[in-house]
Amino acid sequence: MRRAYFVAIALLVAAGGKTAAGFKHNEPLHASSSNFMASVDTVDEDLQSQNLQESRDPKDDLKLSAGNEERTPSALNNFLKEPKLLESIITAGKAMRTEGEANAIEAASKNLNQIESNKRQRIALTHNAVAGHRGHPSPDSDKSLMSVANENPLMLAESLKDQRPTAIMENAASLLKEHDYRLAPPESSTINDKAPDGRLKNQVVTQKAVQLDKNEHVDESFWREELVSVDQLMRLLDEFDKSAHPTTVNRHEESASAVALKSSNQLESITHQRIAPTSNNVIGQVAHAPSNNVIGQVAHAPSNNVIGQVAHAPSSLSPVLVAKNIPSILADRLMKKRPTAIMKNAARYLTQHINRPAPSGPSTNGATTSNGGLNNQLTSQKTFQLDQNKHVGDVKTFWLPTAVDRQSVPEDWADEVAKGPDTFSNDAVNDEVKRVHAAFLEALNLPFHQYPQETAMMLRMVRWKKNAGPNNDITSALFKTLAKDHEEVLRLQDLLGPDLKKLLGDGKMALPRNLKNLQEALIVKLVIMYDLFFRFCYKHEDFVGDLPHNPSPASWILKL
């Protein structure tokens, strides 16, 4: 606008110079319109009283003097320095008679009036140098503007006693310069909870905080500004401080606690016992004995019943531990240079069998014992993982019922003895043998089938005063002799019927069922079963009775 005004003045000066010579100053001509002189007077008044505002165009040559009063061009007095020049312009204007020149002056006057009516709000003063980003006026005229200092990073570094600004300080200063929605606080204090009109003051935060509150996409890198209240901002920051790594929660899926509750209900009747720690040579698969023995439950049986006479049967047993190097131990006891395929098959089955305990009654889901505790049923290794709260959702694979093919106490002792091997003459199946045999079967879920005459032979061996240990060569030689006495393949197959697949293998990898392999399989089975029977007897020495003092063997296959 001011450029147009000065252009009009320049035109007036040029026109006045041409017409001044032809007209006299004291003889004004009669204009066709009386409004021309009024327009010149208006221009004169505006030149003397108009206060120019700050120019937004940095190319303007006029400099503004800052102060509490309205700003005026400092070079205006120099521009209109000589009164004679102003009088010559007015005189020349009065002498103009053309309608076009009058319209130009009238347009310049209107422009000055428009500048006067559109005065902008003065800019607030700052103590520091203001950055190039000028604050925009707020729609609310009662709220003052906030200016941003150029040296914000340096001031932050000085406040935190750092030598130079860090990257975080630079980012904060950059955000302050780019932010156009900040409201200056009414005082030097921090942000108030309530504004004068009772509404919450809004502070700009990012969508990141809102997503953190919802626990959604906490690691995404995009940002979006959104207005939230101060109270909500404080709550979000408190929640962030409580948990530096919030956990993503899927509300559409079932929680882990609900799954664990279902698992507990499903396993309520088949609760498991925690697996006992083992030594270095133990694979960690154990067998738990039932907390109450079935033999103890038949104390009121008739006196002629053999089982009814075992009122003092062992009530509990320690877990059965399985050694890692079973093939090597078997090779040493049988004087072999290296383990055979049958020894490896037997060791593989022992590690997979886990020797689950016998159930407390006809039902696999036992009730409570006499002391009020639950009957513990050993399940697979998956149950141990459930106890550690691992994979709580895979409930279907966490439990296995007690083996239904477990060997039980024979109802017809004569028939069971007839199916067994031909032992020595001094290994008769008497009442004592039946008592120990029944307790042995009920206390443990045996890996291989045990005949009563085999128990009779082992009971005689364990009572030897010398050379009774499982690692003794004499015991192994006795088992070899028993196996060599059976020279018929069909007879050996009948004896090993329940255990043929365990020892000789199954399918395409099965060993041929010839006499040599069948005899070796019987020897390996007897060696393993005697190792377990020896420790059973010394674990319950009072129940078995008449046992000599023998030190515990150094090497073992199964251990209580």
Curated annotation (Swiss-Prot):
Entry superkingdom: Eukaryota
**What's any one GO cellular component for it?**
extracellular region
Record's keyword terms, sorted:
Host nucleus, Secreted, Signal, Virulence
Q: Compositionally biased, Polar residues: which spans?
A: 361-377
Q: What is its main location?
A: secreted
Q: Which family does it belong to?
A: Belongs to the RxLR effector family.
Instruction: Cite the domain annotation text.
Output: The RxLR-dEER motif acts to carry the protein into the host cell cytoplasm through binding to cell surface phosphatidylinositol-3-phosphate.
Q: What is this protein called?
A: Secreted RxLR effector protein 142
What organism does the record attribute this protein to?
Plasmopara viticola
